[in-house]
Amino acid sequence: MSNIIKQIEQEQMKQDVPAFRPGDSVEVKVWVVEGSKKRLQAFEGVVIAIRNRGLHSAFTVRKISNGEGVERVFQTHSPVIDSITVKRRGAVRQAKLYYLRERTGKSARIKERLG
């Protein structure tokens, strides 16, 4: 039974997900339905957490919008996500960057990872 579930989940998983880590700046393009219209909406920010669980994998992106911190959790293999683009690689030493929630301004900056 377990093999059947694994096979079905494998078919549902996206193959074109780029490699990104916490600290990376990414742009996620999401399909949004407003009434009868369907359009793409971009959400750009820093990845602060990644949850790797196969088909149920998710990642959290944080950005500052109008001086207010906004976090959004995306399911990695969701059909709602059109594309994920890595804009900038960040050099961090933690897996979860929840400490960025308390920081603003220059202290919330992340060094760029080279190479």
From Swiss-Prot:
<dbReference type="Pfam" id="PF01245">
    <property type="entry name" value="Ribosomal_L19"/>
</dbReference>
<dbReference type="GO" id="GO:0022625">
    <property type="term" value="C:cytosolic large ribosomal subunit"/>
</dbReference>
<dbReference type="GO" id="GO:0006412">
    <property type="term" value="P:translation"/>
</dbReference>
<dbReference type="InterPro" id="IPR001857">
    <property type="entry name" value="Ribosomal_bL19"/>
</dbReference>
<comment type="function">
    <text>This protein is located at the 30S-50S ribosomal subunit interface and may play a role in the structure and function of the aminoacyl-tRNA binding site.</text>
</comment>
<keyword id="KW-0687">Ribonucleoprotein</keyword>
<protein>
    <recommendedName>
        <fullName>Large ribosomal subunit protein bL19</fullName>
    </recommendedName>
</protein>
<dbReference type="InterPro" id="IPR018257">
    <property type="entry name" value="Ribosomal_bL19_CS"/>
</dbReference>
<dbReference type="InterPro" id="IPR008991">
    <property type="entry name" value="Translation_prot_SH3-like_sf"/>
</dbReference>
<keyword id="KW-0689">Ribosomal protein</keyword>
<dbReference type="GO" id="GO:0003735">
    <property type="term" value="F:structural constituent of ribosome"/>
</dbReference>
<dbReference type="InterPro" id="IPR038657">
    <property type="entry name" value="Ribosomal_bL19_sf"/>
</dbReference>
<comment type="similarity">
    <text>Belongs to the bacterial ribosomal protein bL19 family.</text>
</comment>
